[in-house]
Design a protein with these regions (language model features):
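Conserved class I S-adenosyl-L-methionine
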Residues: 1-38, 53
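Conserved SAM-binding loop of SAM-dependent methyltransferases across substrates and taxa
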Residues: 51-62
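Conserved SAM/SAH-binding beta-strand->alpha-helix loop
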Residues: 73-75
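Conserved SAM-binding loop
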Residues: 80-81
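Conserved SAM-binding strand-loop segment of SAM-dependent methyltransferases
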Residues: 86-98
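A short acidic, Gly/Pro-enriched loop at the edge of an enzyme's catalytic core
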Residues: 102-110
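A short glycine-rich, Lys/Arg-flanked "PGG" loop and its adjoining helix->strand segment in the class I
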Residues: 125-137
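C-terminal alpha-helical "lid/dimerization" subdomain adjacent to the S-adenosyl-L-methionine
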Residues: 142-188, 193-195
């Protein structure tokens, strides 16, 4: 997993953050994700939290919710702790998603933003199963994710739209077809599984644990 470990390096994380806020249409996906969260959400898990951007939006909507943020990049962990300094409802932990999730209790919502695509495909599926077990009945998993294009030309076009080339794209990316992942979620037991938003290689997939 050497490629994923690029995120250990501060320059890799800082380079991503310098571009992330300029990703086209990203806010549309984030807004749609927020609409899918249960109205009674009181406990949230954010996987691969980065600098806490998505979790910040979630907590703006649910200011009294308890949140657990997981990341393993030293740069991202520092930014997470800075962002949520003084908020006793937020717990920040060092955890690499390549490894099984620790025992964390139940959550009303599990969210992730552009993180799980760094895992191998086998690990992605295992992680979706682990998330299912962590969800409370009726809980929702929302994954705003980078997925594979249908053709290489579409992939190159997408990279160009966000300022990259095949030579400069993140070497840790392990992109997978969206529909394969939706089918995985259904086979695991999630209900109401769908792609709720998509722009090129950016997609929001979500499903609910039966109540």
């Amino acid at each position: 997993m050497a490629a994923v470990n690029e995120w250990i390096h501060a320059e890799h994380a800082e380079s991503y953050l310098g571009r992330a806020d300029r990703i086209p249409h990203r806010t549309e996906g984030e807004a749609t994700l927020l609409e899918l969260l249960p109205p009674t959400t009181s406990r949230v898990l954010d996987l691969g939290s980065g600098d806490g951007r998505l979790l910040g939006f979630v907590l703006n909507k649910f200011p009294n919710a308890e949140a657990v943020a997981l990341d393993f990049s030293p740069t991202m962990l520092e930014k997470l702790r800075q962002r949520f300094h003084g908020n006793s409802n937020v717990s920040v932990s060092d955890h690499n998603l390549d490894n099984p999730l620790p025992p964390l209790g139940e959550f009303d919502a599990v969210v992730s933003s552009f993180a799980i695509h760094h895992c191998t495909h086998e690990r992605k599926r295992d992680l979706y199963e682990e998330i299912f077990r962590l969800l409370a009945p009726g809980g929702v998993f929302c994954n705003l994710e980078h997925v594979a294009s249908a053709t290489q030309k579409l992939h190159v076009d997408f990279l160009s739209s966000i300022g990259y080339t095949p030579e400069t794209e993140d070497p840790s990316n392990k992109l997978l077809d969206l529909h394969i992942q939706l089918q995985w979620l259904r086979s695991i037991g999630y209900e109401d599984v769908d792609c709720f938003w998509k722009w090129r290689e950016l997609a929001l997939m979500a499903g609910r644990k039966p109540a």
